Amino acid sequence: PRRSTTTKLLDGLAQRGVKATFFLIGLNLDGNEDLVLRMDREGHQIGLHSYNHKLLTGLSTADFYTEVGALREKLTDLLGHNDFVLRPPYGKTDAGVRKLAGAPIILWSIDPEDWSDTDTARQTAHIVSQAQDGDIILLHDIYPSSVETALQVVDALLDEGFYFVTVDELFAAKGIILEDGQRYTCAKGG
């Protein structure tokens, strides 16, 4: 989380009654514990993204633990639960990541590449034109333009009759049981 942008996003989601899943980077937790507690308290799902946003493929077991296990422990200590999903940095996985994940691996079906394009109108149009039932949309909460895009997408898709839910709620609604080490990009079954 980033205090200014994440707070604005949480406020906007709360005003709209919308829940989301946040994949957190360990380095960004210090000093932002209250934001993470707020996410959890308001019904958002918390996921693991890694400690240092380091590529997880090819890591030794010890290095994987440094990136994922340490974040899992930190979040478990803070939140009092350990029911996390994992989104590897850059969406990159291999057999080692799948073996060591200890959680379902959640990727995405719509990626507007908001890290490289700050045009909110273009981002919003891209997402809204592609969105279908069961999609997982990747956006970041650290860029002001991404937060604006997220809230505009929520408004547009709510107007079209879409519902927004956490990753766990999405797959449960589709009758899909998430399994540790398995990769998921959307929930189109059921």
What are these regions (language model features)?
Residues 15-16, 28-30, 145-190:
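C-terminal domain-boundary segment and adjacent tail
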Residues 8, 54-81, 92-133, 146-152:
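Alpha-helical scaffold elements lining the catalytic groove of polysaccharide deacetylases
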Residues 127-135, 184-190:
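A polyampholytic, Gly/Pro-enriched intrinsically disordered region
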